[in-house]
């Protein structure tokens, strides 16, 4: 009687870390989560700092600062919905390039904008939408939420492109690197402390560096230069009597 036995090939000497664009993409994910968390985290602390009195007197500083930060997260949700609608029409590379550039411009604008007050529509969970008076820098940082909303998907798609059978392991590595959300804000807060508690906007150089790296990844770092590595899952079929 003749049968067919499936024999797995030897364990590959390669892994997701054998691909340069995946390694750079992993760094981009680490940086991205830090940017995503760091922008509203430091923004809220800046607005509610009693010594700086950014929002002025006679207002509920903590409530306003919280609603401004909440609006950032709301814009992230809006951005993801918009990203889902246009994602099939725009390449991951183009989308990441555009939102990284926009995020850079908004952040730099916030850092160097004059101290001019503007009315910002904000979301308050208890009262719905309303207008609050904040510095123009705060409004620009809130808009960064639209940019960060679609970065995860863009980075992931670029980083796993061409990985084939290594994609599953790559996903696990990505999930481990969300720790960037705790490290970059820590760096920002360290800068604030070093400046005597007044350098909140100065700390956004950390965010600028992160966004610049993601722009680099979209333009250059995402190119797969390891196409010689076999990525197909194969099995040998061995006949036996």
Label every PLM stretch briefly.
Residues 79-92, 192:
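Helix-to-loop junctions at the C-terminal end of transmembrane segments
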Residues 102-130:
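C-terminal ends and interior cores of transmembrane alpha-helices
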Residues 162-195:
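A late C-terminal transmembrane helix in Major Facilitator Superfamily
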Residues 205-233, 237:
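Multi-pass alpha-helical transporter architecture, strongest
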